Amino acid sequence: MIARAAGEALVQEGERIVAARGPLAVGEAVVTTAGRLPFKGVIHAVGPQQGIGREEERLVQALGAAFLRAHERGFESVSFPAVSSGIFAVPLEVCARAYVRAVREFMRAHPDTSLKTLRLVLVDGPLVALVRQELGRKA
């Protein structure tokens, strides 16, 4: 969906990155052009699949890498989908903990970051409820 909206420039840049360095590993993130999208860039992060082990840690790592790439580029805001909760089948409870943990850990480690807004874009009602519950817990 993002690639279609962004256009061929994003796809071609992604192909160049993979040709130069190989596919991203779980926990890694890179930035490409946003193409036709009205953004400074698109961050590509690889989250874990259920069953590979340490899913929560690896998801926190992937999101942290994405936030770091945004910080390095001076982005002021970033929106991210429910990474690993769909076809990668990581349980929603694990995803909710990881999303909240990743944001808290990144903000603690980078209090001077240019990032002012971190948006989690959720379309799944149960996941929204779980993230709200996690946000209510003490860090």
What are these model-derived regions, one by one?
Residues 1-72:
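Glycine-/small-residue-enriched capping loops at alpha/beta junctions
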Residues 49-139:
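Phosphate/ribose-phosphate-bearing ligand recognition and processing surfaces
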